[in-house]
Amino acid sequence: MFDYTVEELAGWKAKHGQLYEVVVGEGEDAKKAILRSPSRQDMSYAMAVKDPIKMSETILNNCWVAGDEEIKNDDQYFLGAISQIDAIMQIKTAEIKKL
């Protein structure tokens, strides 16, 4: 499984801001990836894709920082990872009131 140092993590955080660690599988078969939060441009590009799996794949590829390539290339790992994609697409709640 992919591993990283504290220094690498600090460098990635400085470059990308908020990061997420995604672990797919268990034990010796587990694979890990580091993803950054998607930008407005990432979201716009992904939303243009009509297929929900392709949309998640676009976000995964665009937000990929480092990790085990099997997550992108092996369907079982890929499907496990994209099931968690919503967690990195955090949106602030807003209010609107009539004046």
Segments the model singles out, each with a brief description of its role:
Residues 24-99:
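Short, surface-exposed, charged amphipathic helix/loop patches that serve as local interaction elements
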Residues 14-21:
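Short, hydrophobic/aromatic-rich segments at coil-to-beta transitions
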Residues 1-12:
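Short, basic/low-complexity N-terminal boundary segments at the transition from targeting/disordered tails
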